[in-house]
Curated annotation (Swiss-Prot):
<feature type="zinc finger region" description="C2H2-type 2">
    <location>
        <begin position="150"/>
        <end position="172"/>
    </location>
</feature>
<dbReference type="GO" id="GO:0006357">
    <property type="term" value="P:regulation of transcription by RNA polymerase II"/>
</dbReference>
<keyword id="KW-0238">DNA-binding</keyword>
<keyword id="KW-0804">Transcription</keyword>
<protein>
    <recommendedName>
        <fullName>Zinc finger protein 821</fullName>
    </recommendedName>
</protein>
<feature type="coiled-coil region">
    <location>
        <begin position="257"/>
        <end position="366"/>
    </location>
</feature>
<keyword id="KW-0677">Repeat</keyword>
<feature type="region of interest" description="Disordered">
    <location>
        <begin position="278"/>
        <end position="319"/>
    </location>
</feature>
<dbReference type="InterPro" id="IPR036236">
    <property type="entry name" value="Znf_C2H2_sf"/>
</dbReference>
<dbReference type="GO" id="GO:0008270">
    <property type="term" value="F:zinc ion binding"/>
</dbReference>
<keyword id="KW-0479">Metal-binding</keyword>
<keyword id="KW-0862">Zinc</keyword>
<dbReference type="GO" id="GO:0000978">
    <property type="term" value="F:RNA polymerase II cis-regulatory region sequence-specific DNA binding"/>
</dbReference>
<keyword id="KW-0175">Coiled coil</keyword>
<comment type="similarity">
    <text>Belongs to the krueppel C2H2-type zinc-finger protein family.</text>
</comment>
<keyword id="KW-0863">Zinc-finger</keyword>
<dbReference type="GO" id="GO:0003700">
    <property type="term" value="F:DNA-binding transcription factor activity"/>
</dbReference>
């Protein structure tokens, strides 16, 4: 059975971003460069005007174009022509002004072409360099994280910790292993991770001395690979990434302290932290409204369904074994009231399954793939409370049939 792989639409591809910025910079420099004397430049401007007028006359005979496109196109060209004319008038001024113009042109040519073009893909903020742009995008993680939980930007699922969010984001990637969002290197396995790093980014000499002592200092392939660090947000980064280490130095002390503490966290401290997170999650769920609970459950079900679609046979076998062990332990410690409620739920599930088995094959497949249809079917079956005996079940079914007949007669 084929498993459909889904991509993460919020993944930042730095190579594509900077390639587009460099192309924009080159185009901007080419547009401001007009070789030749002033007479030839004026002839070029006149040719542009003639082309614009001829194209506007021939547009009505050729393909159909909207009025908005034509007006925006002509306004942009007219604006460019007026701008060039103003520059030429300034160039015809005395020698002092001409020197100033030439000095500005040479300054623009020798400056960084990416200056002012390093825009954040999330908020369109201009950054001075690539390092500042990467650090700024990392700051967006504070906007993603709320005071209570960590929200997935793809499906909106609420998770209790940054590590859980990072592991959850893998189900939205192209495969189970993603690429580093800071340096852009794709890793397909733990063995080939270091060899597939970008050499211009992963320079060992540029590593900070404060972090070069740990096991994740990227000194060679003989060092054991440590699990990746997933920060609190939409970025997936790796421990061995030098760009990520530089990025950590630019963050606030609290963020650096959090990342270092997670890397060197002992087992007992980790267990205590997980217990605190579970307690906080339980208290948060106890205080949520019924609408919030329903939305959370729908998000969890959808995320679990997507995750199970992408798991392998070995992962599925391990998950089923864990579920059986947990179910056995839970049933051994449940109270009589919880056992009665569980039996009622199982009885409802069996009724729903038998109802689906009586349907047509195509309709059954449609119901199985549509969660809203399944919810509607369950709501229809639960129109009355689950009875205790079969006699009450028959009486309630008869009452429901009579109620439906009354509604149909009133409609006719």
């Amino acid at each position: 059975m084929s498993r459909r792989k889904q991509t993460n639409p919020n993944k930042v591809h730095w190579d594509q971003v900077f390639a587009g910025l460099e192309e924009q910079a080159r185009q901007a420099m080419m547009k401001t460069d007009f070789p030749g004397d002033l007479g030839s430049q004026r002839q070029a401007i006149q040719q542009l005007r003639d082309q614009d007028s001829s194209s506007s006359d021939s547009e009505g005979d050729e393909e159909e174009t909207t009025q908005d496109e034509v007006s925006s196109h002509t306004s942009e060209e007219d604006g460019g022509v007026v701008k060039v004319e103003k520059e030429l008038e300034n160039a015809e001024q005395p020698v002092g002004g001409k020197k100033v113009v030439e000095h500005e042109v040479t300054e623009n040519l020798h400056s960084d072409p990416l200056l002012g073009l390093c825009q954040c893909p999330l908020c369109q903020l201009d950054c001075g360099s690539r390092e500042q742009l990467i650090a700024h995008v990392y700051q967006h993680t504070a906007a993603v994280v709320s005071a209570k939980s960590y929200m997935c930007p793809v499906c909106g699922r609420a998770l209790s910790s940054p590590g859980s969010l990072g592991r959850h984001l893998l189900i939205h990637s192209e495969d189970q292993r993603s690429n580093c969002a800071v340096c852009g290197a794709r890793f397909t396995s733990h063995a080939t991770f270091n060899s597939e790093k970008l050499p211009e980014v992963l320079n060992v000499e540029s590593l900070p001395p404060a972090h070069s002592e740990g096991p994740s200092s990227a000194e060679g392939k003989d060092i054991a690979f440590t699990p990746p660090v997933y920060p609190a947000g939409i970025l997936l980064v790796c421990n061995n990434c030098a760009a990520y280490r530089k990025l950590l130095e630019a963050q606030t002390p609290s963020v650096r302290k959090w990342a270092l503490r997670r890397q060197n966290e002992p087992l007992e401290v980790r267990l205590q932290r997980l217990e605190r997170e579970r307690t906080a999650k339980k208290s948060r769920r106890d205080n949520e409204t019924p609408e919030e609970r329903e939305v959370r459950r729908m998000r969890d079900r959808e995320a679990k369904r997507l995750q199970r679609m992408q798991e392998t046979d070995e992962q599925r076998a391990r998950r089923l074994q864990r579920d059986r062990e947990a179910m056995r332990l839970k049933r051994a410690n449940e109270t009589p009231e919880k056992r009665q409620a569980r039996l009622i739920r199982e009885r409802e599930a069996k009724r729903l399954k038998r109802r689906l088995e009586k349907m047509d094959m195509m309709l059954r497949a449609q119901f199985g793939q549509d969660p809203s249809a399944m919810a509607a079917l369950a709501a229809e079956m639960n129109f009355f409370q689950l009875p205790v005996s079969g006699v009450e079940l028959d009486s309630q079914l008869l009452g429901k049939m009579a109620f439906e007949e009354q509604n149909s007669s009133s409609l006719h």
